[in-house]
Amino acid sequence: MEMKSNYVDIFKREIFPAKVRVEKGKIASIERIDTPCDTYILPGFVDAHIHIESSMLPPSEFARLAVCHGTVATVSDPHEIANVLGIPGVGYMLDNSEMTPFKFYFGASPCVPATTFETSGATLGPDEIESLLKMPQIKYLSEVMNFPGVINGDPDMLAKIAKAKALHKRIDGHAPGLRGDELTKYIEAGIETDHEAFTYEEGLEKLQKGMKILIREGSAAKNFEALAPLIPAYPNKLMFCSDDRHPNDLAREHIDGHVRRAIAKGYDLFDVLRIASVNPVEHYGLEVGLLRVGDPADFIVVEDLKDFKVLQTVIDGEIVARGKKPLIDSVTVETPNHFHTGIKKEEDFILERCVHTEIIHALDHSLITEEEIMDLSSGKAKDVLKITVVNRYEDVKPAVAYVHGFGLKKGAIASSVAHDSHNIIAVGCSDALIAKAVNTIIGNRGGICAVTEEEIEVLSLPIAGLMSDKDGFEVANRYADLDRMVREYFTSLLSAPFMTLSFMALLVIPELKLSDKGLFDGRSFHFIDSCRR
């Protein structure tokens, strides 16, 4: 393969017309030429932290969408499927990822389950983590979500970190809002990165104390605006990530979106491209080429350096996307799963209304919630709905609480994507509709759905209740239709209602969340009653 294009050299910070020659999947030569060129060739983009499962696609199908946006590799935490299926679930992701030329690099997830206050489908202890870390496909210890455990010297958590250190593996962090002396303790334990900084000040402190910061822009958590001002001072210490990206958003853009926004804000081109490609490759030691002689031929050709419209994506010398069309074939996939709950009844979702009721306040574009106290005894409170988490691994009574912020005026929605243990989560306008939505998910053995008295609309997710076995672009369109239905027909106030719903059970991010065991205060790490006595 040989192509002529304007060569973007991130290391020497220069751009010049060049002839790039590829042989046997490697960059054989880069030769300056005098001929003017209309396009630009640069290293492919890398998502430095993503849960592939959140795209609702297995790796082989995720790759088909991602390459259209110039992504050639991901640093992937298989935390979601590990919570459902354990080590066999991680093995599923590894095996499936090998069916595509895309470069997936997986980690060992140390917080399965994320806390002891919820029911998951599996548990990964220090021995299981060690066995994963010894696998050549496992590059790092994934996000250490239990930061209170690290700070307070939890033996299990520290043992997992010690396993990673002994095997010279990188260690990822997850510490929303952690500052001061507690942050120092967390870093001293060996934690190297964080993708959970929500403010400039938080990101700056973490950088100054030695961490690397991942600027996240996902389907729910959006921190780009807050953290982008860090770029000029810390271009070598930053990476871009999406963390959780739903299929409709992945079909629209990926890391190319981060790059476009950063350039539009006037940040230095070479700094931005370093963050999008070089930094994750160097930090994690990825076998991803950076467009140097001898490197694997992983690169993209773009129309210009403003909009970054991807014309070609190349991995190991193979053209894997041209324009917005993938050149990677879909593959047939298996559908392992884990569902052991029974059909639920309307009366399973009865909950007392009281004068001082604890309410979860869901916030748009945020994983954090707020605690509210409302008088529900009169039944006049506006936009207060029931929310439930149903244990899908055992047939037990659901947990029920109240939530504010969804804005539904009709219907109910439910999902088996409920971070991080992935029980069934639902919110709705009546107990009957909530039961209908929950039972729809149970009947499909996983998925997302929107129901009314007359209608049932569902996207089935038969792979662990997390991923579809259908074409990725079809899944993206179906998800977009359901999302639009909830926003427009159900009048949800949220820009991504299913994504926000999926994080209402994530106990490690405050303030109030709901697990299958009850209402949980993520600040004190204790269960609380819905009714304040």
Curated annotation (Swiss-Prot):
Source lineage: Bacteria, Pseudomonadati, Campylobacterota, Epsilonproteobacteria, Campylobacterales
GO biological process entries: adenine catabolic process
Under catalytic activity, the entry for this protein gives: adenine + H2O + H(+) = hypoxanthine + NH4(+)
InterPro entries documented for this protein: Adenine_deam (IPR006679), Adenine_deam_C (IPR026912), Amidohydro-rel (IPR006680), Metal-dep_hydrolase_composite (IPR011059), Metal_Hydrolase (IPR032466)
Q: Which cofactor does it need?
A: Mn(2+)
Q: Per the similarity annotation, which family is this?
A: Belongs to the metallo-dependent hydrolases superfamily. Adenine deaminase family.
Any Pfam family matching the protein: Amidohydro_1
- Could you confirm whether the keyword Manganese appears in this record? yes
> Which UniProt keywords are present, listed alphabetically?
Hydrolase, Manganese
Q: Where is the signal peptide?
A: none
Determine if Hydrolase is one of this entry's keywords: yes
Q: What is this protein called?
A: Adenine deaminase
Q: Under the GO molecular function aspect, what terms does this record hold? A: adenine deaminase activity
The EC designation for this entry is: 3.5.4.2
